Amino acid sequence: MDNKKLNTLIESIDQWVIESNDEKISELYRQSSKADNEFEDIPILKDCITLAFNILLGDSLVGSFKTDLMKKLFLLDSLNNYKDNINEYFEKVNNNITSLNETPLNQLSVLLSGITFLNLYVQINWTGPTVQISPDFTLKNDNKSILELLEVDGETVYKKVKNPIFLYLSKICLVDNYSMLDSCKSSCWWSCRSVMYHQRSLKNATPTFKSLLNERFQIVTRFYSISTLLEDSEEFMDTSSSTTSESKKSIKEINGLKDLASRAIIEQSLVFNYFRQLNKIKESMERACEVSELDCALTGALGKRTRFQTFDTAQLVMEVKNCRQRDDSGDGDNNNEFNRNSSIKREVTNDDPTLLVRPSLIEEVKGQNILLRNVDQMLILLQCLNVKNQNSNNGLTTEEMLPYIQKTLEKSNNWIIHSMGLLIKSRLEIVSSKTAERAVLQIQALVDQYDDPTSSATERINAIYSTDYPARWDLEKEVAERFIGIGAAASAFEIFERLEMWDEAIKCLTFMGKNSRSEELVLQRLEIEPSPELYCVLGDLKSDEQFYIKGWELSKKRYSRAQRSLARFYLEREQYQLCIDAFQIALAINPLFPNSWFSLGCAAMKIEKWDTALNAFSRVVSLEPEEGEGWANLASIYMYQNKMDKASSALMEGLKHKRENWKMWENFLFCCIAIKDYQNAVIAINHIFDLNDKKVNLKLLSIIADHVVSKDQLDKQGISGSKMEKTVSELFGRLTSKLTNNPDLWRLYSSYHHRLGNVDKAIDLQQKACRSCESAHWEGEQSTFEKVLQFNTTLCDLYFQYPNTSNIYSAKLKVKSILKKCESSWKETEHYKNFEQLLIKLNNYESELLQKK
């Protein structure tokens, strides 16, 4: 085989593996198995074909270990010799790889080996079914050494993870030696997958992996954009010159490329979701739908939700407006190994006597019976996650998410996709007392199906990377958490104890009132195997800082949780500087903890370390853009520093997520007035009025009124006062219609119209102001007495400016009435005497007006 043909074949194998083209790989494997085949002279290539076949179609990935390639490269025949020094084994494997000539064939062999190890690790810990692994790979004593090697940014791998050696070997092949795989186009994508499942094996998100995944997925989505894939493809559809069979083949291949491009974006979106980069998910999801040509939306349809419902009501359902048809065979969309009937049995209905599993519709919705491609089902699951991310956790969000799940479960034909749909459905149902039991049983069924024979390992692996399906230990943890929710704390404790999740186990014991048993359990575990985590748990139980410090020292100052716990210990005792110091140490190791940044910011504000607080809350909102309280505190610091523009922007962001917080609206109002953003100030006043028991800040309202009266003066947005006149007039009208007994508001409203030249309106409003201030027994209090006189004086001044006989006459009668009512109590006061002079002036005015007539 000449070099050109060899290199072309290597590129093809690389492409077929990443797109799961089992038809092409199967055909190639059959050719390589024949006698006198063209691959006999290239044993490494033949082994690579075997590896590729096992990755996509083999009964067991372990079969790849029998190839000479893997035996030699990974020292499989002598693995047992390194049980006492696993570090030496990893070094030798790495040396074997780095010493290879960087030929395309050698690069492909390293890539496929890394994929084999990664898929094995994921199969064992995520998808199942159980695989028989050689005892040489089961290093019970040395697993601790491997777990330490897999620590990143102070975050540890789950202690009871199975066969972490496979994750480390995939890391050596796909991540550590990534630079030598430049001839393999898919190496970047597989590197991302290895990193992502390494991250998902850790207890918390890490900045190192966040940065790495964001950077490399940009390369992946560029390499695997649909335009790039179509350009690189040698065959393209040309219906004008092709036969029908060739045309169908071309359509199928183009659909495969669209699936591949869509999956690249889906996996990037799952990274965004994991690291809470929520602002990026919507855009990437829309791109994926565009590439896959999927157009779906929620709509309403009449139907029944309960078994005994006698009338039809509106149901929220999904309408598929456009999508590509599912292929007849070959792309994994119609895998015969997946038994549809068996999958339906895995959906727990619990024979609910009232609720239907799905709404029964009176007529079919567009796209209801369409067979969606696997990639489109993955996209719908992703859209469901986006609904949850974009909305608060309430009943409306649940109702909006359910149609996505129901659509996925209707016609799904992939084991992992169907399982993911069932899992999300159970998470939604757990909040309702009517469906909580069914939800718990459903998650338990998903745990029990690990060895379900209806789906092969290769089918599960093919879809796992494009879904958010949890690890087996996380799924069992979720079962235990649901048990607590329905009151079965003892059952939950048994699960947590078996999983060695001591934090959660202690919470169960506390929930059951067994506090002494909690401490006893931790001390027992410390005697068996001391760990930083257990010392932190003991510190929580005893409220003693020395245990956090001991855990920190035991971890060689790498376990950031110890410093976070220590910081909260100091925060509770108002030792703010010590709290700040501890948080800064913890966050220097792993800064992806928004709650810790928030607490650090609060502590810094307490001792007026404004720069520290500003940095802390800036980090909070960058990690959690929907954290309204973080935006509010950030704005408070800006306001303290008199940076009103920045404060206003921060509050505007925060109010997107905390619209019911009237205090934030009040701060926003102050900022808007300070920067002369009167349009938003009006919005703020309306919200404060609605949320805070009809409270109105008249001083700030008068500033807005002054702007309108100024006519030509522009505000921050370039809006003149005259253009805001209608808006502000409507604001006054709304406020006074709901707050009728506030004389100061009526007076301000009157003054506003007076200055605009609306005299009759001003007089009418001032009359209402006068009436509203004359409460019962007003003459008995000096303050109310003076206010009544002041308001009526203002009304008379309006009459004097625009006199007519009837107004002056009614004013004279009103003043006489007030003077008579107050004579006994306030006759000797200056206000009373001035009011008497007002009566004289009214009499004179009346005489003058009568003479003119």
Swiss-Prot record:
Pfam (any one): TPR_16
Q: Which Gene3D superfamilies match?
A: Tetratricopeptide repeat domain
Question: Which PROSITE patterns does this one have?
Answer: TPR, TPR_REGION
TPR repeat locations: 486-519, 525-558, 560-593, 594-627, 629-661, 662-695
Keyword list, A-Z: Repeat, TPR repeat
**Composition bias, kind Polar residues: at what positions?**
332-342
Renumbered residue ranges of the record's region Disordered: 324-345
SMART domains the record matches: TPR
PANTHER family hit by this protein: TETRATRICOPEPTIDE REPEAT PROTEIN 27 (PTHR16193:SF0)
UniProt family annotation: Belongs to the TTC27 family.
What name does the UniProt record give this protein?
Tetratricopeptide repeat protein 27 homolog
